[in-house]
Amino acid sequence: MRSIRSFANDDRHVMVKHSTIYPSPEELEAVQNMVSTVECALKHVSDWMDEKNKSVKCEGDVEAKEEAAESNAKDQSGRTLCGVMRIGLVAKGLLIKDDMDLELVLMCKEKPTKTLLCIVKDNLPIQIQKLTEEKYLVEEHVNEAAIIIRNTKEPKLTLKVILTSPLIRDEAEKKEGDSVAMKDPPDLLDRQKCLEALASLRHAKWFQARANGLKSCVIVLRILRDLCNRVPTWAPLKGWPLELICEKSIGTCNRPLGAGEALRRVMECLASGILLPGGPGLHDPCEREPTDALSDMTVQQKEAITHSAQHALRLSAFGQIYKVLEMDPLPSNKSFQKYSWSVADKEGTGSSALKRPFEDGVGDDKDPNKKMKRNLRKILDSKAIDLMNALMRLNQIRPGLQYKLLSQSGPVHAPVFTMSVDVDGTTYEASGPSKKTAKLHVAVKVLQAMGYPTGFDADVECVSSDEKSDNEGKNETVSSISSNNTGNSTADTSATLEVRTQGPILTASGKNPVMELNEKRRGLKYELISETGGSHDKRFVMEVEVDGQKFRGAGPNKKVAKASAALAALEKLFSGPNAANNKKKKILPQQTKGVVNTAVSAAVQAVRGRGRGALTRGAFVGAAAATGYITPGYGAPYGYSTAAPAYGLPKRMVLLPVMKFPTYPVPHYSFF
């Protein structure tokens, strides 16, 4: 898995390359003016042709002239020219410098003929002169079934207007014998060109619906179109097949992608061999019959593109994407210092920079590890480490460490994970209530053993003290801490939250806030309120509604944001004076007898616990119990301890278990 920093570097190169191939504002304005002018002129040509046809039909017919206005309003489909639509690069927004082919489709009511093409060509310059003072050259190309329009000013632009009709496709799809074939006019335009124009219209509508909304898709398409223009190997893929591949590659990802990562994903798709013979092919979604969009490419062309994509993917993996884009490598956006971190990072005001390359070191000491350790000591002794947890810091010092899960012990409701890591032949172990916490403890041990002040000693002590208090059932300490936190200032609260964000977010009792809130209020729904930032710096805001109140939390991912929202709800509703209102506690009367007093205190401790401790079902006073052991309740999980029913005991049941202690030692693994 590549680091986020490498994707950010790819994003910078791709965006710089995109800025060099994107048309200038003057070029875009010229394109917009030319296309709008021709569209309006074609509308005037259509009106002129309709008026001419009506005047011919209505000569000498007074009644027909009176009904002309009504028929025009009722039957708009009677126009000879039905409409004009944008297709190709103009409709999809894929224009780049030196590749600005402008295309329009002129839809006709009947099958287009050479006569109709000449009429439109002759009248179009007249209508253009009425709209603008700019001069345009209008030419007819019968073989292309189109009219070519060129401007005389800079930048030089060419607009192609293709004539077609829906009747051509309908007739082509009819089977023999279904209907009587209509006679085509003798001067009918090229049928294949008209069909291609209809297909281009479908492609434009599909692209606007599926690809325009994908983040980075249009940018990647412009980059790849420039690649097709520069490299002859990629030329056969240019056009509709390239658009399909980009949409499928980027659209199948479950999250928005940056420009660099999206380009790499397209290259991965091509490098996997989907173009090669025997592969899945490329389905054309705009055709009724199953059609392969790659059918026009030869086997040799497919193999050449696959080989080129694999080479580009290797260059990108080694940080040389600038070679794929044919541009100069960009300088780093952060100035490197003599040490591994910049001055701003030492002061805690910036994020960590890239490591110093080994070849940059100067001195007699040739061991790069010793150089890095010496530099780290100089930095860490002068200032505290910036806001990074021990696991992230260790990964910067020794990247690629493998953490292993040694064991998982404890009951299901209170597991204990033991993780280990091997550093320079020495194995370090640590435990925690979760794998993440155990890994964090291991990282702290390794940093301490290597002689680096971690700044997380207080966190480790807090975690260990919380675990001890949980095991002993001393919830009084937790309640006092929560009450003290309630009385603290806003600055103290924000400082506490900052410390918590270094590692996994846990409640005062050491549990996951989402799990603990779910135990108190089941069936809660978390909603995503907002998602901001780039692909390498996301910011999510989640919201949860508890008892009619809404709580929000933010974080770099949805999991952390949910935990923050749940933690806010717990601190607001289930801590301090609010805890008594939301959760009623039943306190049993104190007894003065020895054994019974011990049993009562144990039951009270269990009731006060945060949920991990098991409540003994117990027997009624006076019930017989076997000597030598504690009477177990039903449902004890795996023999670790006795357990109460899943949904609590009856309210009036006497919670006084009869406990008889043996005269000989009880094995520690039997019931505790």
Curated annotation (Swiss-Prot):
Swiss-Prot/TrEMBL keywords: Cytoplasm, Developmental protein, Differentiation, DNA-binding, Repeat, RNA-binding, Spermatogenesis
GO cellular component terms listed in the entry, alphabetical order: cytoplasm
Highest taxon of the lineage: Eukaryota
Compositional bias segments (type: Basic and acidic residues): 356-370, 465-475
The keyword Manganese appears for this protein: no
Start-end of Low complexity biased regions: 477-490
Pfam families assigned: dsrm, DZF_C, DZF_N
One Gene Ontology molecular-function label: double-stranded RNA binding
Subcellular location: Cytoplasm
Domain annotation DRBM: ranges: 386-452, 509-575
Region (Disordered) location: 348-370, 463-494
Entry-linked SMART domains: DSRM, DZF
One GO BP annotation of this record: spermatogenesis
Domain DZF: 5-362
PANTHER family: SPERMATID PERINUCLEAR RNA-BINDING PROTEIN, ZINC FINGER RNA-BINDING PROTEIN
Protein purpose: May be involved in normal spermatogenesis and sperm function. Binds to double-stranded DNA and RNA.
Name of the protein this chain belongs to: Spermatid perinuclear RNA-binding protein
Organism, scientific name: Gallus gallus (Chicken)
